[in-house]
Amino acid sequence: MLLKQGDSLQYLLDVRDGKIKQGLGLDCFLDEHLRFKPKQLNIILGHDNVGKTYWINWYFLTLALKHGLTFCIWSGENQKGQILRDMIQMYRGKHFSKLSHNQISGDLAYLEQFFTFIDNSKLYKPEEILAQFEKSGCKVGLIDPFTGLDREMSFAGNYEFMNKARQFVNQNGMTIYINTHPNSESGRGGNLYAEGELKGHLKAPLKDHIEGGKSFTNRCDDMLVIHRLIKHPEHKYKTWIQVEKVKDMETGGKHTEMDFPVICEFNSGIGFQINGVDPLAPFRPNEKQMTIPKDGQIESTSDKLRRLANQNPF
């Protein structure tokens, strides 16, 4: 099908007049580099055991509570209960052991309005995961990790999947994040810091270290690298976010500079802090806080959050 001539005029005029809508942020420094946008295919890269999934869960939780986005998650290496345990702890801002049974059950019911999980007891083909995403009706999908799928392990096979995933987001409007691992070369001696305070520690993988080749980076919209110095006595509590690709900077986001990642402080496991800002803080439940909506009925904070969650940010 050929597109009509002139059908891009309104977009061009909006660009000229500064009316292009920005991607969704978290109201912290991370927004300068990373924005959520609909209809995108995004890649996440990082070494094993640096906390990629943990950071992704925090990021998704914050987007859900702030913007009402809904997520469909396939996590081949983590159980649903483990993910929800971490999310509830972040949401409450308290360690899980300090929560009552009633708090846990209430928070579970609330958060499951935003998060749907795909059964990981089955080995899925890529097209089966995409079908589950569509069935969920969610705004966002996560494949974690790509290497856990029943797939053709070849460069051509990776391109075929990325092309199908690209067509899926274009037609469906969903945004998909794909969590990936780097190749073996990225973990060898040549990728260690050679001097200074970080001597001997493993560097973050380069964009082109992604296992399976450049088919992923060539076909994705945005790409970020998650890294952590897991053996450093101080830096092991800091997660680095390096934004390596932003396809459309007009709608927000930009590359992080070399050696200047966005630093996310672990914050004792109750939700990351970035430059002293805890993006989850405004959305944590406060049983004493009540609000009066326009119709004069009393509305608890939790009810207000549920109401806001049903509003479409786009």
Cite the ranges covered by each PLM segment.
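Conserved catalytic network of the ASCE P-loop NTPase/AAA+ motor domain
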Residues: 35-36, 65-67, 107-110, 131-136, ...
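Structural recognition of the conserved hydrophobic beta-strand(s) that form the central parallel beta-sheet
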Residues: 73, 142-143, 174-181
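Hydrophobic/aromatic beta-strand patches that form the interior of the parallel beta-sheet core
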Residues: 42-44, 72-74, 118, 177, ...
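Conserved inter-motif catalytic segment of the P-loop NTP-binding fold
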Residues: 67-160, 291-292, 299-305, 314
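The Walker A/P-loop phosphate-binding site
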Residues: 1-93, 314
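Alpha-helical scaffold elements adjacent to nucleotide-binding pockets in ATP/GTP-utilizing enzyme cores
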Residues: 82-90, 161-164, 215-219, 242
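Cofactor-binding loop segments of dinucleotide-utilizing enzymes, especially the Rossmann-like FAD-
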Residues: 76, 181, 228
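C-terminal regions of RecA-like/P-loop NTPase motor modules
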Residues: 1-17, 130-141, 170-172, 185-314
